[in-house]
From Swiss-Prot:
Homodimer. Part of the ribosomal stalk of the 50S ribosomal subunit. Forms a multimeric L10(L12)X complex, where L10 forms an elongated spine to which 2 to 4 L12 dimers bind in a sequential fashion. Binds GTP-bound translation factors. This is Large ribosomal subunit protein bL12. It comes from the Bacteria. Gene3D superfamilies: 3.30.1390.10, Single helix bin (1.20.5.710). The gene is rplL. The lineage of its organism: Bacteria, Pseudomonadati, Thermodesulfobacteriota, Desulfobacteria, Desulfobacterales.
Length: 126
């Protein structure tokens, strides 16, 4: 049996017809008590579920809940953070709750939250 190499087996299989390959697979499954389809299906089902479990939120939105008593200070901070003009920043603050920044990293969201809270605003990160 040492005379037959892996390359010989592969060459033999490469020359088989589809029907012969199908019969060979069935014979191997019966002889060794295995199934060619089950492991593939199990891996395919487990793959997406595992990916969802490991997925962590990477983008955050900073939501201005209220300007509080220091509306002018909050408007100034909103302008500095967003680059909006005075009119747009004032409208954003008056329409609270409203997103100040969207889709930013957690560290950046924390910095923006600290800036706005320092000016007297109530802020949430989602």
């Amino acid at each position: 049996m040492a005379d037959i190499t892996k390359e010989d087996v592969l060459e033999f299989i490469a020359n088989m017809t589809v029907l012969e390959l199908s019969e060979l697979i069935k014979d191997i499954e019966e002889k060794f008590g295995v199934s060619a389809a089950a492991p593939v299906a199990a891996v395919a089902m487990a793959g997406p579920a595992a990916a969802d479990a490991e997925e962590e939120k990477t983008e955050f939105d900073v939501i201005l809940l209220s300007a509080g008593d220091k509306k002018i200070q909050v408007i100034k901070e909103v302008r500095a953070i967003t680059g909006l003009g005075l009119k747009e920043a004032k409208a954003l603050v008056e329409e609270a709750p409203k997103a100040v920044k969207e889709g930013i990293a957690k560290e950046d969201a924390e910095k923006v939250k600290e800036q706005l809270e320092g000016a007297g605003a109530q802020v949430d990160i989602k």
